[in-house]
Amino acid sequence: MKGPSIVVKGARAHNLKGVDIELPKNKLIVMTGLSGSGKSSLAFDTIYAEGQRRYVESLSAYARQFLGQMDKPDVDTIEGLSPAISIDQKTTSKNPRSTVATVTEIYDYIRLLYARVGKPYCPYHGIEIESQTVQQMVDRILELEERTKIQLLAPVISHRKGSHEKLIEDIGKKGYVRLRVDDEIVDVNEVPQLDKNKNHTIEVVVDRLVVKDGIETRLADSIETALELAEGNLTVDVINGEELKFSENHACPICGFSIGELEPRMFSFNSPFGACPTCDGLGQKLKVDLDLVIPDKNKTLNEGAIEPWEPTSSDFYPTLLKRVCEVYKINMDKPYKKLTDRQKNILMNGSGEKEIEFTFTQRNGGTRKRKMVFEGVVPNIDRRYHESPSEYTREMMSKYMTELPCETCHGKRLSKEALSVYVGDYNIGEVVEYSIKNALYYFENLKLSDQDKSIADQILKEIISRLSFLNNVGLEYLTLDRSSGTLSGGEAQRIRLATQIGSRLTGVLYVLDEPSIGLHQRDNDRLINTLKEMRDLGNTLIVVEHDDDTMRAADYLVDVGPGAGNHGGEVVSSGTPNKVMKDKKSLTGQYLSGKKRIEVPEYRREITDRKIQIKGAKSNNLKNVNVDFPLSVLTVVTGVSGSGKSSLVNEILYKALAQKINKSKVKPGNFDEIKGIDQLDKIIDIDQSPIGRTPRSNPATYTGVFDDIRDVFAQTNEAKIRGYQKGRFSFNVKGGRCEACKGDGIIKIEMHFLPDVYVPCEVCDGKRYNRETLEVTYKGKNIADVLEMTVEEATHFFENIPKIKRKLQTLVDVGLGYITLGQQGTTLSGGEAQRVKLASELHKRSTGRSIYILDEPTTGLHVDDISRLLKVLNRIVENGDTVVIIEHNLDVIKTADHIIDLGPEGGEGGGTIIATGTPEEIAQNKGSYTGQYLKPVLERDSVE
């Protein structure tokens, strides 16, 4: 290979079979292949891992002790490596304090901007707060028209209650003759009696002047006198003109509201100097939600209308409730909604000071008398949540609470002082509510004075530069205050990508994992241009990707395969995209060249009257949308990034159905009405969250096939002789498991301020079970051997047991034949976890009344995997069930029976229904971006 290159020899990480490959440096390299073929093993676990390890090795021993020992990847040699940076999808912060602006460091520059050129205003009077010298005050007064009559007033009392007799007397003794009391000029000896219960303003008339040449000295002396009297404040009463207010205190001259010196930390919601004191800078407060406390208002109190007070472990609260109802004559057999407002208020907010006596039965069976003020259900839940030392109680109470915007800062996170500072017409809280697109426009067109411009010039350059990068990777719809925990994997990755471009590093090896996830075809070109820009800076990019456009744009394409798991781990083809397309061995090449394709269905399923209707959807950016989801068909919801797809499907459709069908406590987004729920009895949300939070969860336990496998082992002769039951073969209970590692197979070593380290258990050698259990075999294999089998191997191994084979076959059908039965759930990718969930639903009996919701199921899937997935989804629909998918992938969109296209843009520019209908109908709609990209695909892939 001409030019510098990265040479990998003998890579054996995971399923790689001694891979040798040479990759050109300073190029855009795309690695592709089936899910599980070994792409990530080569890109991340070999090339990136070694680049990172070598960089750490080059640091001092002192620095290395904080970074920990990095294992050398299973590879013979790698030459030509550069320092490596990985941009994957697993590193998004879920911290509620982390926002788009903080992650990209834009917020640091905005804080600096407000600290350096911000202008503080009094939040009560709208007056600019500025500290002025006597000379500045003189100059401003002399700017008034000549012969203007003025009075210099010293405001000694501002809006304060009291009769202030002593103060007025003291002013008279100092020789002052006139006062202005509540806007009336009076003689100091003739001030009327002031009502001590009302607010009053008292100003001393220090001097009366006519503006003309030669008054500078007298004016300055009088100003100094007034400032001394009024502790640094001065009012100039301009006769027949507007009053002027001055202060030398950096305080409001009317009410004294003051702000200290402006500094960046004052605008940080992560600092006590800037955070809102009520919500501590979170912008949200947990409040008791009455809809969660009383989910069914048709129930009576005796039927358990107040859900948190149902008699469970104790009858304390039910007895108290009964006694309260007796005292206040509340009918416990009347539906809650028919109670009077007064009765509801007593139940929810308490009875005031009145004490109530009652006797309740304790857990031990004894009785006890109590006399107490009835605090009400809402204060009770709030108190128990905030004051209980029990984690269990706090968790139970939180089920009846909802996060609402803080009442003090209205969700802006900052203190009153920080929100009183303006640059242009907006404070910092208002600016971060802008979308990236609008923020870019605002900062590019910000009007500043010449002096402020010279101060802010460099800061604005940094802000505009970072915003431009975010805009260029298709994230213009995100608001700067969006919590980073709510970002999709693709969005989070593109944010990190934009941050890296902003750093302008050169000579770096970047390894990226599917940056096109969640991106509409329209925005793909911008992402590809961004990747090329990074390459042109002198960097090498290795991108694991399945997207057609990205593969075609690559300088060098590597196809890993030919299959998945044990059938993969080899480089099938590498070279320019054109070279790979001509390679008959390359599955990717065949799809790229059009020799293989996912064909458009010959017919679309008929849309009947059976449907779920949503009216008045207003969640997030949705603009009062009415939409129908037809049942027993495959519906795909499309639209550019940020157009409102997730708001409609995940926030409203799923949560509203889950609330009605599953009695879920999750509150749906804002909408008016939903109809047609009675036609469904089951809702399944198949998302990409892990199948379990601990290493114990695995595909075998999640799909339920492990129960059947344990039955098989319990039925063996050896197990019967030893008296082993099914439970003996569980690694979750005592008996058959290894007690040294409690059945985990690994031991967790806590490293305190470093991440926890997991090492294989030395007693069972990672097999999870004790020696006696492993002596029981079926067809020559023990239970640990079975857990180490791939799904495909296990399907053949158990082919004579239909119950097990059927469940395993569903995993094969969704393209997961390569994963092992005992693979830790935490190590599965989002796409793999989603397909395990799909498989576990597939082997259950269909009712024809189920609805499946999937959000971008093609994540991590090769086009051949997508072909399999579509067969599975169509199988679900053929059974009479309904599938609703959010998707950008055109291969999925073209096979839909019905499309709902949102847009036209992202963020505020979206939230409306652009078009609905078959793919052919959408393709004819000129207002639909999806239609524009769908049209040529339909023409190309239709069955001839």
From Swiss-Prot:
One of its GO terms (biological process) is nucleotide-excision repair. Gene3D superfamilies: ABC transporter ATPase domain-like, ABC transporter ATPase like domain, ATP-grasp fold, A domain, P-loop containing nucleotide triphosphate hydrolases. Keywords: ATP-binding, Cytoplasm, DNA damage, DNA excision, DNA repair, DNA-binding, Excision nuclease, Metal-binding, Nucleotide-binding, Repeat, SOS response, Zinc, Zinc-finger. Residues 309-587, 607-935 form the ABC transporter domain. Signal peptide: none annotated. It comes from the Bacteria. Forms a heterotetramer with UvrB during the search for lesions. The UvrABC repair system catalyzes the recognition and processing of DNA lesions. UvrA is an ATPase and a DNA-binding protein. A damage recognition complex composed of 2 UvrA and 2 UvrB subunits scans DNA for abnormalities. When the presence of a lesion has been verified by UvrB, the UvrA molecules dissociate. Belongs to the ABC transporter superfamily. UvrA family. This is UvrABC system protein A. The gene is uvrA.
